[in-house]
């Protein structure tokens, strides 16, 4: 039986079943983001609602600057502790208009990612899938899931 534990940014749960370790990082919105490390050292990052949440097309210059500064501060912390992440799930939210992929692009510039999964795109699979065509991260494999429950086997 596994007990449930609430986590705050900075918390680390170690020695979980199967040798799993979980670290929580701050978010720019609700909750936290998580880095899971498996017993074999594989790292899996789930951003939750961590993103560069500003709408360049709608935000004031000040709102955009504040959102960008907070995002970069948290991203720098994550990057300082993780130069490479094997699997990352990160928001690519088309509601943000022209900036819908900004946070993901900055994340991929700061941290080497082997396999990237866009999320938080509200069913707009085309936009999420198009992201991989212009992301500047040649060492990253981009995976697009086209329906809920779809799986991908990684090697």
Where is each model-derived feature located?
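Binuclear metal-ion centers of metallo-dependent hydrolases, dominated by the metallo-beta-lactamase
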Residues: 2-14, 100-155
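Core dinuclear metal-dependent hydrolase active-site scaffold
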Residues: 4-84, 149-155
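Active-site glycine- and acidic-residue-rich loops that bind
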Residues: 27, 95-98
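Structural recognition of the beta-strand scaffold that forms the well-ordered cores
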Residues: 45-46, 86-90, 116-118
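Catalytic metal-binding/acid-base residues of hydrolase active sites
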Residues: 51, 91-95, 120-122
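Conserved protein kinase catalytic core
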Residues: 55, 97, 126
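A short, acidic, amphipathic alpha-helical segment used as a generic capping/interface helix at domain edges
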Residues: 72-78, 97-106
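Metal-dependent phosphoesterases centered on the DNase I-like endonuclease/exonuclease/phosphatase
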Residues: 79-84, 89, 107-109
